[in-house]
Each structure stands twice: as C-alpha cells, then as structure tokens.
Amino acid sequence: MFDWRRLKPLRPHQIFFFYTTIQNYSDNGYQYSYKSNQIKSNQIKLNQQQQTSRQLIRINNQLPPSVVLHNIIMKSILITTGATITFKSLIQIILSPQFLNNLIRLKINKLIIQYGHEIKNSINLSESFFNETINKYDLINLFNLEIEETPIGDDDDDEGIRLFKNSDIEILAFSYSSNINKYIENVDLIISHAGTGSIIDCLHLNKPLIVIVNDKLMDNHQLEIAQQFTKLNYCIYYSIKELEQYVNNNDNNKDSRFWNQLNQLINGELQLNKLPQTDGSIIETIICEELEK
C-alpha cells in the first residue's frame, strides 16, 4: 500500500496539474481537457479585448481633439458654411466623394458640418440642398454609411442634427447651432466661410483656420478681410474656385497646396499666429480699413 506520508509538499504549479488531472478522471481513464480549457481561456481574453476596444472608442469620442489613446488617434474638422445664405458650392465640394476620400486618406475620422439655415416659406432651403447633394452623390451607398437621426449632446442648441458614420469616418451635420463655440472648441481645424463673425469666433478660440471666400458675391468685402487676416498669418484663405480645382483635380490631389496645408495644420507642422487677447482694436482696424476701400 502506498504511504501518502512519504509525499513531499507540492509546489503551486504541481498542485494545479494534480488538481486538473484528478478532476478529469473517469471510468474510461484520464480525459485531458487542457486544450479545451485553453481555447475557452483565449476566447474569454478575446472578448475582453473587444469589449475594451469598444470602450476606448466610446471614450475617445468624448475626449479633446487629437488625443492619442492606445494608438487610436482622433482627428476632427468643423466646416461652417454660414447661417443665412446657403453656400451651395461649398456644400457640393465638401460632400463630394473626392473630398471625403481625401479626409479618410489623411486619417481625419470626424467631420462636423454646419450647412446653413436659410428659411423661405417655412422651408429650410439649406437642409433641402444638403439632402439633395447627399442623394446626388449617393453617399449612403458609396461609403456604406449608417444614419442616426437622434440628436446628440445638447439638442436644444442644435437644429436638424444627424450622424452619418462608417468604420473610417463620422459625419455630424446640422443646420444651425446657437452654441457653435462648443464645436469650435473641440475640433483640430476649422474650414469656414468668410463671414467676419465666424472668422473672429474661430480666431478668438485659437483654432487653425482655413477661410473659403465666396467670390460670386457682389461688393465682396469678405475677400479683402480674408486677405488681410491671411497677410497677418492668422489664417489661410482660398476662393471657392480654387478649392474646387484642388478637390476635383484627381491627378494632383495628394500633392496639392490645399491638402498639404490642411494636413500640416491639423498635425501642427504649420503654425499660424494667435490673435492677441486685446480689446478688439486689431480686428476693428482690419475691418474698417477694408470697408473704406
């Protein structure tokens, strides 16, 4: 008979092996389930990793712009087209497949669009044109976009807000916001129409700014004001015609001045001057000088 008192104390790994062996004993002999246990363990780890990844994505959506968390980099752009008049040519450009594909190529994964609030006979003409443009380019099918109509965040501030998204990019679009600064504060870069108020809002919050001038407007003081701010290195400006040429020229998209400058600005490789926090005399001087010309 075996003398159990002669057994030496077992080490932890030996206890584990002994326990695993005994618990799998049956009338038919030993049944080793180590491999099965290993597969289950790996599956549990995989599920935990997937859950963690989903949590990280949700966390990143609430973080300030360009935060790096476990190699997930969030880059975001706000495009504002103005409120009272629909900037149709700008909307057509920024919703074009060429424009969106270049954003994805530059790893810009969040695009926020304020498309306008032009009302006539109780109809939001800006929203109608925005929807028509999406349908014209067939963006939902082309980019396999999911749509969420439910307002996000402070819905009392926003009108007509929707979210379009796929695995590469999120497009948050709204007609008007009474608190546009909450979007300006939380993006990496802004592309804005050349309205003086919009330019000043962006510069006061020290955001890299590209201004798009509607050169079809009569008595276009927007152009002169944008030129002066650019001369002082507070922003960069393009006419809508120039932007259209850069976006639609497929052969030179990767090397175009617009896309290079946008990429450098959003990555901090191109620095603009910050508008001094003064009593506004610089802004007043620029505006008055241009209006007097």
Swiss-Prot record:
Gene Ontology MF annotations: N-acetylglucosaminyldiphosphodolichol N-acetylglucosaminyltransferase activity
CC terms in the record's Gene Ontology section: endoplasmic reticulum
Entry's EC annotation: 2.4.1.141
Catalysis: reaction(s): an N-acetyl-alpha-D-glucosaminyl-diphospho-di-trans,poly-cis-dolichol + UDP-N-acetyl-alpha-D-glucosamine = an N,N'-diacetylchitobiosyl-diphospho-di-trans,poly-cis-dolichol + UDP + H(+)
Pfam families: Glyco_tran_28_C (PF04101)
Location within or outside the cell: Endoplasmic reticulum
InterPro entries the record matches: Alg13-like, Glyco_trans_28_C
Any GO BP: dolichol-linked oligosaccharide biosynthetic process
Organism superkingdom: Eukaryota
Principal location class: endoplasmic reticulum
EC category name: transferase
UniProt keyword annotations, A-Z: Endoplasmic reticulum, Glycosyltransferase, Transferase
Job of this protein: Involved in protein N-glycosylation. Essential for the second step of the dolichol-linked oligosaccharide pathway.
Subunit structure: Heterodimer with ALG14 to form a functional enzyme.
Family according to the record: Belongs to the glycosyltransferase 28 family.
PANTHER family per the UniProt record, alphabetical: GLYCOSYL TRANSFERASE-RELATED (PTHR12867), N-ACETYLGLUCOSAMINYLDIPHOSPHODOLICHOL N-ACETYLGLUCOSAMINYLTRANSFERASE (PTHR12867:SF6)
Protein name (Swiss-Prot/TrEMBL): UDP-N-acetylglucosamine transferase subunit ALG13
Gene: ALG13
